[in-house]
């Protein structure tokens, strides 16, 4: 576990440099540039180290159980996560790297299992214009989550 957290910390250190390095430009960028920056930071979040024991919420959809398929769905879409991170005031944090690691491990890296069909269905409810919370997105998509029993 310690080794995993070290890997996350190492990558988050680099990600934080990217975020802080682009923030000033991001705030004055036009909407097309902002979307590009958000997509790029979102992709970087995707490449942070995975560990199912740490990041899996323990929830699976009824449809995924019925179809016997597991597709990972992150509670917070990458673009939403990127936007939040780009708008975060990192200067007020005494240990911004630790904050970013914690945000990834407790929020942005977390995922449930859903069916492939549900994963596609969720897309329209996870767009930045409509996304409010993971619970609302799942409810709007008609997805019921239950505890995963191996």
Regions of interest found by a model, annotated:
Residues 37-38, 72, 108-111:
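Short runs of predominantly hydrophobic/aromatic residues within well-ordered alpha helices
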Residues 104-130:
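Short Cys/His-centered divalent metal-binding micro-motifs
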Residues 102-107, 135-137:
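A general structural signal for short secondary-structure junctions and capping/turn motifs
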Residues 1-68, 88-89, 126-149:
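Nuclease and nuclease-like effector domains acting on nucleic acids or nucleotide cofactors
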Residues 30, 93-94, 115:
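Residues that cap or delimit alpha-helices
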Residues 66-104:
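Histidine-centered nuclease catalytic patch
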């Amino acid at each position: 576990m310690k080794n995993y957290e070290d890997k996350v910390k190492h990558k988050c250190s680099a990600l934080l440099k990217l975020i802080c390095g682009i923030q000033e430009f991001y705030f004055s960028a036009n909407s097309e540039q902002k979307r590009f920056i958000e997509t790029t930071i979102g992709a970087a979040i995707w490449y942070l180290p995975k560990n199912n024991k740490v990041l899996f919420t323990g929830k699976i959809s009824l449809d995924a159980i019925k179809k016997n398929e597991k597709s990972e769905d992150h509670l917070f879409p990458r673009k939403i996560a990127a936007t939040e991170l780009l708008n975060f005031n990192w200067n007020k944090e005494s240990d911004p790297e630790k904050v970013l690691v914690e945000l990834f491990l407790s929020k942005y890296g977390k995922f449930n299992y859903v069916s492939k069909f549900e994963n596609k269905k969720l897309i329209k409810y996870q767009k930045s214009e409509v996304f409010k919370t993971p619970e609302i997105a799942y409810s709007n998509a008609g997805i019921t989550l239950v505890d995963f029993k191996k």
